Amino acid sequence: MNPIAFHVGNLAIRWYGVIISIGAALGLLLAMYNCKIREASYDEFINMFLIAFPSAIIGARLYYVIFEFEDYRDNLINIFNTRQGGLAIHGGIIFGVLAVYIYLKYRKESFFEYVDVAAPSIILGQAIGRWGNFFNSEAHGGPVTKEFISKFPQFIQKGMFIEGTYYHPTFLYESIWNFIVCIFLVYLLKKTKKKGIVFMAYIGLYSLGRFFIEGLRTDSLYLGSIRVAQLISVLGIILSIFFIYNIIKN
């Protein structure tokens, strides 16, 4: 796949950045609708986004670099080069949520009211953003047979044929799962008024899908022999169950 979308003069604009931007824009449009459901201020949401989005990008990059530091030790300037990928979503979620918590505490606004509204937008952005991995030929799984990959559309087959071998399109599996979760979260946002349930459902459901999909990937970040994303996913599932149980109980 050609990772370059177009050029502006001598500057190459990559699909990775274009797709992340599209995901963010569509997430904001969805949030406009969801703010009306919860009667939350969209202006406040925009302010929150302007803090959360750059914080998430920084967090996603730092998280990735920490676990792959050997690749940057001899050329530290490359730490700042994200144009070819190298963003870890768990780092983005952690930094983004932390930034939002600090901002909303300063503004004396309800944290769970706004992250509930944000949850469908976040997972929508993740669903779209995974296609950036497709154009970068990354975040794929292990080798598969031609017979297996032939069940997918031709452009997926072409994109997953890398250096003479077909690979699991794990980016696609996660994208589809995230779209399904997004639809469910919008439904849940309409059905429940209990603050925190939608956001914690997002954490739990995303973690559930990511745990299984991560087992197929070939580019996992490791802590010893443990896949970090699977470890974080297990913690996310446990945390979401604990919080949802307590929210419903109280």
Curated annotation (Swiss-Prot):
The protein's predominant localisation is membrane
Its subcellular locations are: Cell membrane
Q: Does the keyword Transferase apply?
A: yes
> Does the record's keyword annotation contain NAD?
no
Q: How does it sit in the membrane?
A: Multi-pass membrane protein
Please provide the record's keywords in A-Z order: Cell membrane, Membrane, Transferase, Transmembrane, Transmembrane helix
Q: Which GO terms describe its biological process?
A: lipoprotein biosynthetic process
Q: What EC number(s) does the entry state? A: 2.5.1.145
Q: Which residue ranges run through the membrane?
A: 11-31, 49-69, 84-104, 109-129, 169-189, 196-216, 228-248
UniProt xrefs under InterPro entries: Lgt
Which GO molecular function terms does the record list? phosphatidylglycerol-prolipoprotein diacylglyceryl transferase activity
Binding annotation for a 1,2-diacyl-sn-glycero-3-phospho-(1'-sn-glycerol): R130
In terms of Pfam families, this protein maps to: LGT
Q: Name one GO cellular component term.
A: plasma membrane
Q: In which pathway does it act?
A: Protein modification; lipoprotein biosynthesis (diacylglyceryl transfer)
Relate the protein's function as given in its record: Catalyzes the transfer of the diacylglyceryl group from phosphatidylglycerol to the sulfhydryl group of the N-terminal cysteine of a prolipoprotein, the first step in the formation of mature lipoproteins.
Instruction: Report the family membership.
Output: Belongs to the Lgt family.
Could you tell me what this protein is called?
A: Phosphatidylglycerol--prolipoprotein diacylglyceryl transferase
Recorded source organism is: Clostridium botulinum (strain 657 / Type Ba4)
Q: What is the lineage of its organism?
A: Bacteria, Bacillati, Bacillota, Clostridia, Eubacteriales
